[in-house]
Design a protein with these regions (language model features):
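Extracellular glycan-interacting surfaces
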Residues: 1-176
Length: 176
């Protein structure tokens, strides 16, 4: 049962499995805001995509490094745009698709060789080219779709950043 996606329409009172499962434990999942039938789920180094609300999944892992995927984020305006991050060391920390995961582009740019734990597309109600990456060595941002990354150091402790959250109504970024 742990390899399945579950759904509730009763605020968590009743949960119904909606998928036949993946080949492993689901680590991360993201649902498109613009098309709720599109969702991505990760399992280890694999990523799967569903376009039928999670009933069926197809692997969209081709062309990606063989490391554990640590996060997936779908652009609020387009189910075809998603960004994923990887653990471990070596080239290729952040990848992006603009064609619904038919192909992936390495947008790691000049990121340091350290695991990336989370990613967020900054979206204050209009499309931007700003992304944030939470890493084992701090938080980095890009304003050119990943070509160059800059560390956010002012006022932040030198510590592991595991999670990013953006609240659009207050325009606040939270880091955990």
């Amino acid at each position: 049962a742990r390899e399945q996606v579950f759904k509730t329409t009763t605020w968590g009172v009743i949960w119904i499995p909606i998928s036949s499962g993946t080949s492993g434990v689901i680590r991360e999942m993201a649902i498109s805001r613009s098309d709720p039938n599109t969702l991505y789920a990760t399992s280890g180094a694999a990523i799967y995509k569903s376009t039928d609300g999670g009933v069926t999944f197809a692997s969209v892992t081709s062309g990606l490094p063989g490391r554990t995927i640590t996060s997936v984020y779908v652009h609020p305006d387009s189910a075809n745009v998603a960004v994923i991050t990887f653990s471990g060391f070596g080239a290729g920390k952040v990848y992006k698709t603009t064609n619904g995961a038919a192909s992936w582009i390495n947008i790691s740019g000049n990121l340091p060789d350290s695991p990336v734990n989370d990613v967020l597309i900054y979206y204050p109600g209009v499309a931007t080219n700003v992304y944030y990456a939470a890493m084992d060595i701090g938080v980095f941002f890009t304003n050119d779709y990943g070509a160059t990354w800059v560390e956010l150091a002012d006022g932040l402790p030198n510590t592991v950043a595991m999670h990013l959250d953006y609240h659009q109504a207050t325009n606040r970024l939270r880091i955990g």
